[in-house]
């Protein structure tokens, strides 16, 4: 809905790449805590060079990221503009009072506009959706095996990365530099043993 309002075009939600949190494990949370970070479910909408990139997926963020502290029944929206810079909107997204407020707002709009509903700013023109994985971004990735055994393979495939290990585990993790999803998949295949990948904003 927000993308439709921002672009003035109709967005088919079925075209948006969507990944929930069912594949996020306790091990992922342990790594995040070790790094002073958290895993959040983000809806991402990016306008770059006239193309709109969309995605719903978990993202790893650290405490410096504005949406890091959004928890429980609260929702946050981070808007970044070329002139505005970063602006954040924060508030309750569930509960009887926020829900009642939204319902009353709809009732007031219905009374005010009657048979001519309030125009919310988008046409019937279809928006061409591009997967956000086509954008360059960092990735957090877990691999089976030891850092020592695979360090050279990781360096050859990914270049400069940050290694993260948890004591007593038969695996290790890395934080990559910026790359597209396709570039990540190709590099991970060279290393082998990928257990998890999560986009990161650190």
Language-model features: where?
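Substrate-binding/catalytic subdomain of NAD(P)-dependent oxidoreductase enzymes
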Residues: 1-69, 74-76
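Short, exposed beta-strand "edge-strand" segments with a Pro/Gly-rich flavor and a Y/T-containing core
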Residues: 7-11, 17-23, 103, 164, ...
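Generic structural motif recognizing short loop/turn segments at the entrances and edges of beta-strands
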Residues: 11-14, 35-40, 49-57, 75, ...
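Conserved N-terminal alpha-helical segment that immediately precedes and caps sugar-phosphate-binding
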Residues: 21-22, 52, 95, 164-168, ...
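Generic structural signal for well-ordered, non-membrane alpha-helical segments
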Residues: 21-25, 96, 100, 147
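Short secondary-structure transition/capping segments
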Residues: 29-39, 86-94, 98, 158-168
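Catalytic, metal-anchored helix/loop core of enzyme active sites in primary metabolism
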Residues: 53-144
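A conserved regulatory-domain signal marking ACT and ACT-like small-molecule sensing domains
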Residues: 107-202
């Amino acid at each position: 809905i927000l993308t439709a309002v921002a672009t003035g075009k109709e967005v088919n939600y079925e075209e948006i790449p969507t990944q929930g949190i069912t594949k996020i494990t306790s091990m992922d949370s342990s790594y995040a805590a070790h790094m002073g970070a958290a895993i959040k479910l983000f809806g991402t909408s990016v306008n770059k060079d006239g193309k709109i990139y969309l995605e719903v997926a978990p993202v790893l963020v650290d405490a410096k990221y504005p949406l890091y502290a959004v928890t429980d029944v609260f929702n946050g929206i981070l808007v970044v503009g070329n002139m505005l810079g970063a602006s954040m909107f924060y508030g309750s997204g569930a509960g009887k009072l926020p829900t009642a407020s939204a319902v009353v707002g709809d009732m007031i709009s219905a009374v005010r506009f009657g048979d001519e509903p309030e125009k919310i700013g988008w046409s019937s023109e279809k928006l061409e959706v591009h997967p956000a994985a086509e954008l360059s971004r960092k990735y957090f990735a877990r691999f089976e095996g030891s850092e020592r055994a695979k360090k050279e393979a990781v360096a050859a495939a990914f270049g400069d990365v940050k290694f993260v290990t948890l004591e007593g585990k038969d695996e290790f993790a890395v934080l990559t530099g910026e790359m597209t999803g396709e570039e990540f998949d190709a590099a991970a295949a060279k290393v082998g043993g990928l257990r998890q990948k999560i986009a990161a904003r650190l």
